[in-house]
UniProtKB/Swiss-Prot annotation:
NCBIfam families: S6. GO terms for molecular function: small ribosomal subunit rRNA binding; structural constituent of ribosome. This is Small ribosomal subunit protein bS6. Binds together with bS18 to 16S ribosomal RNA. Belongs to the bacterial ribosomal protein bS6 family. GO terms for cellular component: cytoplasm; ribonucleoprotein complex; ribosome. Residues 125-146 have a biased composition (Low complexity). It comes from the Bacteria. InterPro entries: Ribosomal_bS6 (IPR000529), Ribosomal_bS6_sf (IPR035980), Ribosomal_S6_plastid/chlpt (IPR020814), Transl_elong_EF1B/ribsomal_bS6 (IPR014717). Residues 113-124 have a biased composition (Basic and acidic residues). It comes from Oenococcus oeni (strain ATCC BAA-331 / PSU-1). Residues 106-146 are annotated as: Disordered. Signal peptide: none annotated.
Length: 146
């Protein structure tokens, strides 16, 4: 069974109900053709680097699914090309083991970065406290000497 990640961009001028109907329709196209949908969610509305069909932004939707054959992929591809509501789409075959490794590496890198930030912040606070204490001592020595 092959695993896929599908990303498609929906026109930004669709209202919520029409967009929900579009997502439901295309999710059912996948499932009716033998795909098992693992996740189907909106990602974000993003600005494009260039205009696509006179639109400067679009709503990205991501679907992860698995399928025995390419029937669901081919049918989605065919109907997405016809639909005027989907500006662009891309289907990628995913190796789940490599994806899990990549997510684990990303999480570890994020954790290390957070630890380094916290350490730098603690060092900065300690240096400021030391500087403040020496300034107070200098001020106290100056005022007591008068």
């Amino acid at each position: 069974m092959a695993n896929y990640e599908l990303t498609y961009i929906v026109r930004p001028d669709l209202d919520k109900d029409a967009k929900a109907a579009l997502v439901t329709r295309f999710d059912s196209i996948l499932s009716d053709n033998g795909a098992k949908i693992d996740k189907s969610e909106d990602w974000d509305t993003r600005r494009f680097a260039y205009e696509i069909n006179n639109y400067r932004q679009g709503t990205y939707h991501i679907v992860t699914f698995s399928s025995e054959d390419e029937k669901a992929v081919n049918e989605f591809d065919r109907l997405a090309k016809i639909s005027g509501d989907i500006l662009r789409h891309m289907i990628v075959a995913v190796d789940l083991e490599k994806l899990a490794d990549a997510h684990a590496k990303q999480a570890a890198a994020t954790q290390r970065a957070a630890e380094r930030r916290a350490q730098r912040e603690a060092e900065r606070n300690a240096a400021q406290a030391q500087s403040s204490a020496s300034n107070q001592a200098r001020t106290a020595a100056t005022t007591s000497g008068k």
